[in-house]
Amino acid sequence: MQKNELEQKLLQEEVSKDLYSLKGGLPNESYCFNEQNGVWEVYYSEQGIKSNLKTFNSETEACEYFYTSLIEMLKGMGVI
């Protein structure tokens, strides 16, 4: 899965865009996906801090991890 496919899957699942960022950065209380210098990052951003940072050398692995982790978290919270 590539980033554009990830975005489409999240739209199909009707996951609110307020809950995640596929552009990285440090939005408050968002699950984030970012590429920096060929390394893909997945993390939770809260109050300007990257929490639970995971790094990947593969976009595919990062996308799959992001999707699975975000969906599991949202199901656990009863959001979806």
Regions found by a protein language model. Give the residues of each.
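Intrinsically disordered, low-complexity charged/polar segments
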Residues: 20, 73-80
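A short, charged, amphipathic alpha-helix used as a generic interaction element across diverse proteins
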Residues: 55-73
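Intrinsically disordered, low-complexity segments enriched in small/polar residues
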Residues: 18, 29, 41-42, 63-65
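Negatively charged, low-complexity tracts enriched in Asp/Glu with abundant Ser/Thr
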Residues: 1-25
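Short aromatic-glycine-(Arg/Gly/Cys) micro-motifs in beta-strand/loop hairpins
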Residues: 24-51
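Surface-exposed loop/turn and secondary-structure junction residues enriched for glycine/proline
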Residues: 18, 36, 56-59
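Short, exposed beta-strand "edge-strand" segments with a Pro/Gly-rich flavor and a Y/T-containing core
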Residues: 1, 50-57
